[in-house]
Amino acid sequence: METIKKLNWSPDIIHVHGWIASLLPLYLKEYYKDEPLFNNSKVVVSVYGNEISGNLDSKMVKKIQYDEIESETLQVLEKPTYLDLYKNAILNSDGVVIAGEEMDESILNLTQTHNKPTLKCGFKEGFKKEYLDFYTTKILN
């Protein structure tokens, strides 16, 4: 995000992949909310099935709060798991790509409950047109 600021580039879409980048939507919507370069940027997250199981450090929320991110936006991370990272990313994104063949039901329910534009593509080849349609009609609209 800091590199984008230094380049003075305002991206139309920021697409993040997997649990490793799942805090970026939160930071973009909360930490960088007053940054003019990101005012019109849309965030899409790709989620994958069969992720790592287990819990994350419970101090994670305190570390995020250090960046002055409000507690109510972190409720899903109170007892953080890798699945909860995805949930937080979805809640702070403008669209979701279901890229895994098998997806946890709670992820699918969350996208429906919050009316998130969703593209289910799995790992098939030749989905360029589907992405283009998704970006232009569902995300940038």
Language-model features: locations:
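Catalytic cores of nucleotide-sugar-dependent glycosyltransferases that transfer UDP/GDP/TDP-activated
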Residues: M1-N141
